[in-house]
Amino acid sequence: MKPTTLLLIFTFFAMPGIVYAESPFSSLQSAKEKTTVLQDLRKICTPQASLSDEAWEKLMLSDENNKQHIREAIVAMERNNQSNYWEALGKVECPDM
């Protein structure tokens, strides 16, 4: 009886984790969304110097307000809300270069 009880307890606690586990492609999807946002920001805030994508990303995310607006844009993209997406990108402040 004791092994059965332990099995039931384990199942009770393990199942929610299995059911709510993220898809293995979720990180790829969020990386794609982030890349799309940064590409659209390059169109809005055209850098004068040719920066690498990594340097551009660091520059754009160095400001806390920009981070928040970029998060808002990603959420709008996930919800397929184009007007909120472009509104959030419009709030991003282009850095001085």
Swiss-Prot record:
**Superkingdom classification of source:** Bacteria
Question: What InterPro entries does the entry give?
Answer: YicS_fam
Q: What is this protein called?
A: Uncharacterized protein YicS
Which organism was this protein described from?
Escherichia coli (strain K12)
Q: Which gene encodes it?
A: yicS
